[in-house]
Amino acid sequence: MNNSYISPFAKPVYVMLKPVGSVCNLACEYCYYLEKGKLYPEVKNHIMSEQLLEKFIEDYLECQTMPQVLFTWHGGETLMRPISFYKKALELQKKYGRGRQIDNCIQTNGTLLTDEWCRFFKENNFLVGV
């Protein structure tokens, strides 16, 4: 894709990534998402594989027509994936980003936040929603 010309009519594409599906460490009464796992009873593991992560990032960046791209990580509880998963995501964003500005936001219930997570988010400019 040639990004040297961006149409004034170009529209960004937005999606939320759910790297753990509906898996969560809480069972909040108001949560609309806990029941979603029951929609696919044959699927025992709703965790995003690294192969799917790479394919998604490559395809998502390929379809973007804007110079700035946003990745929104949502759950279930996103921090149930290890930091290494998100480090891999950042590597893949750089690999397939073709120099574009890439931003990341992540939604968490906050119960699994540690100093290590906070350093990672700060060092990589994640917008964190709790």
Model-predicted segments: where are they?
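Cysteine-centered catalytic environments shared across enzyme families
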Residues: 1-10
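Short glycine-centered, acidic/aromatic-flanked micro-motifs in structured strand/loop junctions
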Residues: 19, 75-76, 108
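Alpha-helix capping and helix-loop boundary segments enriched in small/acidic/polar residues
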Residues: 43-47, 77-80, 105
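Radical SAM/AdoMet-radical enzyme domain recognition
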Residues: 57-58, 62-72, 81-130
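Conserved, mostly hydrophobic/aromatic
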Residues: 24, 28, 73, 106
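Well-ordered alpha-helical segments embedded in enzymatic catalytic cores
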Residues: 52-56
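Short acidic, glycine/Ser/Thr-rich loop/turn "cap" segments at secondary-structure junctions
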Residues: 39-41, 71-76
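Canonical Radical SAM [4Fe-4S] cluster-binding loop centered on the CxxxCxxC motif
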Residues: 9-51
